């Protein structure tokens, strides 16, 4: 995908801890690989731009998942791990499994609430942005790495239990991986080809 250079003036350098927060993202059912729902097949309307591979941002292009991203930044996680339950075209054994198919290292942050409210005011017939009722809307910027469907890290209930975590591998799962667990996931994904440019 073609890269978009954004003006980083006004962005703040970010110093996070060596931790990765899991963030569920909607993916396309019409794609052979887990990519963002650009066609709005899930009828959410908000997922069309996030994560934004082209600008290496999350939350800058659209006001989506604001509370979760704000919480990740407040908790000082250095990484966002993108998870999904893939339901696309491929008839693989991985279909309907919970996959971590990419990550983002947060290098910079910016409060973009005013930006999103101004976009809404310019087009008031659109849906009210999630950030309208919030004090802040933090967008994040940094390098991203996404892998193919077959190269994704499979997160299972059994693995979570083995690692000492409670919960099920589902869209509601809010978990922070640290130290060896985070390293294992990042090393696994880094060992696979980068698919952003495909």
What are these regions, as identified by a protein language model?
Residues 75, 99, 114-115:
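Elongated alpha-helical scaffolds
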Residues 14-15, 69-74, 92-96, 130-131:
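A general structural signal for short secondary-structure junctions and capping/turn motifs
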Residues 47, 52, 104, 111-113:
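Compact, glycine/acidic-enriched structural inserts
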Residues 20-89:
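Short N-terminal edge-element motif at the start of the domain
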Residues 88-90, 109-114:
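Eukaryotic short linear interaction motifs
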Residues 95, 99-110:
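Short beta-strand-centered aromatic/proline hotspots
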Residues 1-31, 111-198:
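Contiguous surface segments at macromolecular interaction interfaces
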């Amino acid at each position: 995908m073609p890269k978009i250079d954004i003006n980083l003036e006004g962005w703040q350098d970010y110093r996070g801890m060596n931790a990765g927060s899991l963030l569920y993202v909607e993916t396309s059912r019409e794609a052979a690989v887990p990519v963002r729902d650009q066609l709005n097949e899930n009828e959410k309307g908000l997922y069309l731009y996030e994560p934004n591979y082209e600008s290496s941002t999350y939350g800058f292009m659209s006001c989506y998942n604001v509370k979760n991203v704000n919480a990740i930044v407040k908790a000082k996680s250095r990484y966002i791990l993108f998870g999904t339950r893939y339901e696309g075209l491929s008839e693989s054994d991985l279909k309907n499994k919970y996959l971590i198919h990419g990550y983002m290292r947060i290098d910079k942050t910016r409060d973009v609430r005013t930006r999103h409210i101004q976009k809404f005011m310019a087009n008031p017939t659109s849906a009210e942005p999630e950030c309208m009722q919030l004090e802040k809307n933090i967008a994040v910027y940094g390098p991203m790495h996404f892998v193919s469907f077959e190269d994704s890290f499979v997160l299972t209930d059994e693995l979570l239990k083995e690692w000492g975590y409670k919960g099920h591998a589902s869209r509601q799962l809010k978990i922070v991986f640290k130290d060896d667990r985070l390293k294992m996931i990042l090393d696994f994904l880094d060992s696979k080809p980068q698919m952003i440019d495909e």
